[in-house]
Amino acid sequence: MKLLHVDGSILGPHSVSRTVSAAIVDRLRAQHPGLDVIYRDLAGTPLPHLSGAVLAGAQPNATNTPDVQHDVELGRQVLEEFLAAEIVVIGAPLYNFTLSSQLKAWIDRILVAGVTFRYGPSGAEGLAGGKRVIAVVSRGGLYGPGTPAAAAEHAETYLRTVLAFIGITAPEVIVAEGIALGPEARERALAGALDAAAALKAA
């Protein structure tokens, strides 16, 4: 069984989403001793943002400069990692009301027409269903349903939309919020998220 672990936080060891996503992977490793884990630290090794040159360079028979060809091949590798994974664990902090740009760059490499989705007479159809996706969303403030800032939350809502678009309609989402509201609030949020991670089903 293959697991892809993706972290989008820029905060390293101070990151709540990284702490919780790592705990999830550790739990799944313990439950599945033969688990094959691929890890992408999108802050430590950022992916280049998608460009017109790369889109053109990915077309059949394209003639590319070495830099563009490297970027095209990197995009293919990222896509293949995602397609091969049966489980995907995503650490997704909320930065300025949305995902980190590093995580968005990864998403742009896995949303590929004809591979993870396609357009037909009835609109878009997801082609990447069947995966188990577990996302950890960390938020400094309070953005949950019913809060004054709920409409400004574009990390969890965006992730759910993107995943549904490619056929993953039931992701498991763990939220840690209020982590910037003081040390006690941070500890409560982290503890609650770790408890939720420990309660995840084995498979």
From Swiss-Prot:
FMN binds at S9, S15, V16, S17, S138, R139, G140, G141. Gene3D superfamilies: 3.40.50.360. Binds 1 FMN per subunit. Its cofactor is FMN. The keyword Flavoprotein applies. SUPFAM superfamilies: Flavoproteins. InterPro entries: Flavodoxin_fold, Flavoprotein-like_sf, FMN-dep_NADH:Q_OxRdtase_AzoR1, NADH:quinone_OxRdtase_FMN_depd. It comes from the Bacteria. Keywords: Flavoprotein, FMN, NAD, Oxidoreductase. Its EC number is 1.6.5.-, 1.7.1.17. It catalyses: 2 a quinone + NADH + H(+) = 2 a 1,4-benzosemiquinone + NAD(+); N,N-dimethyl-1,4-phenylenediamine + anthranilate + 2 NAD(+) = 2-(4-dimethylaminophenyl)diazenylbenzoate + 2 NADH + 2 H(+). One of its GO terms (molecular function) is oxidoreductase activity, acting on NAD(P)H as acceptor. Homodimer. Belongs to the azoreductase type 1 family. Quinone reductase that provides resistance to thiol-specific stress caused by electrophilic quinones. This is FMN-dependent NADH:quinone oxidoreductase. It comes from Methylorubrum extorquens (strain PA1) (Methylobacterium extorquens).
